[in-house]
């Protein structure tokens, strides 16, 4: 068991190398890796379950008792970043409204489910992350059409039942199940079961990333100058999303866990839902900016997560000492 857990830690420490390899494999071998697509929701659900084993219902309730961080994350991801995407894309690609539309749509969709995997890996606030992702998805049937209407004058409708069903299967049900097991076993789920499942989740994450990357194969293998410019823009703006989350959290002097959660929930988007909307309501040219995030999102999450973890090592050590001191004081 020690070797198995050690393998999980090794994989977690090298994700910044593993993730680009997974993306490359997905792009180069779409047919072979595409066979994983039918089981991706189940892989998501299992990873959510494993991450939720470290949480309690009391922690989730605290998010709603003090909702400032939740409201702030939703404001940044659903209002601030879409407006910034519209302003910057209009500046660089104003002559092509389809590209502007694709970029705005990319940053109008809900927070990515995969954000929870990275937040769990880098020690973020799990209950806050779950609440942000679920709330972002629940309000998206209102926020997406409203954003597109106000910024672009476009009208779309969202398949609400399908989206809610997916969120329930991938996030809500496995999260509740994980928390229930942790509560009933009085911490055994967090201390024993979660570490035992962690290595398997790392392999599942690789499969999910590679599978999602297959959607970009056609575009990447037939790249032109304009697409390259759009890809560069998406790369820079995607980095900005993570940084904005960190800066907002730092401005409010939030601790490491909450800052990590803000970083990933502001920087990561549910690209698959954006791709569905793009293909249903807009010309084909709109799809490329939306799907382009697939190339960078997971790679950036890995790199930025590791960089932030290193830069805050001293701060986290001080936090651990304060927590340990508090525990010692309570036991005396």
Regions found by a protein language model. Give the residues of each.
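Alpha-helical transmembrane segments of multi-pass small-molecule/ion transporters
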Residues: 1-332
């Amino acid at each position: 068991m020690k070797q198995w857990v050690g393998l999980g830690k090794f994989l977690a420490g090298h994700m910044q190398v593993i993730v680009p390899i997974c993306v490359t494999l997905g792009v180069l071998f779409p047919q072979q890796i595409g066979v994983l697509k039918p089981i991706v929701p189940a892989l998501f659900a299992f990873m959510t379950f494993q991450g939720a084993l470290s949480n309690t219902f009391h922690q989730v309730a605290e998010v709603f008792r003090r909702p400032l961080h939740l409201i702030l994350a939703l404001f940044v991801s659903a209002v601030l970043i879409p407006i910034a995407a519209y302003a910057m894309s209009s500046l660089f690609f104003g002559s092509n409204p389809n590209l502007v539309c694709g970029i705005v749509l990319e940053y109008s969709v809900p927070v990515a489910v995969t954000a929870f995997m990275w937040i769990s890996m880098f020690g973020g606030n799990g209950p806050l992350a779950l609440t942000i992702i679920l709330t972002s998805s629940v309000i998206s049937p209102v926020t997406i059409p409203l954003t597109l209407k106000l910024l672009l004058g476009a009208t779309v409708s969202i398949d609400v039942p399908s989206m809610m069903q997916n969120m329930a299967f991938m996030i809500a049900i496995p999260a509740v199940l994980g928390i229930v097991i942790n509560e009933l076993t009085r911490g055994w789920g967090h201390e024993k079961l979660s570490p035992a499942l962690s290595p398997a989740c790392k392999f599942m994450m690789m499969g999910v990333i590679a599978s999602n990357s297959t959607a970009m194969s056609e575009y990447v293998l037939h790249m032109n100058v304009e697409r390259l410019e759009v890809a560069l823009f998406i790369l820079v703006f995607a980095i900005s999303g993570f940084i904005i989350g960190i800066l907002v959290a730092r401005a409010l002097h939030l601790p490491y866990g909450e800052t990590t959660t803000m970083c990933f929930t502001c920087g990561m988007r549910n690209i698959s839902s954006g791709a569905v909307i793009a293909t249903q309501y807009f010309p084909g040219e709109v799809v490329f900016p939306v799907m382009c995030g697939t190339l960078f999102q997971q790679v950036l999450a890995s790199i930025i997560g590791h960089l932030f973890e290193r830069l805050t090592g001293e701060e986290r050590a001080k936090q651990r000492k304060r927590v340990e001191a508090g525990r010692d004081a309570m036991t005396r």
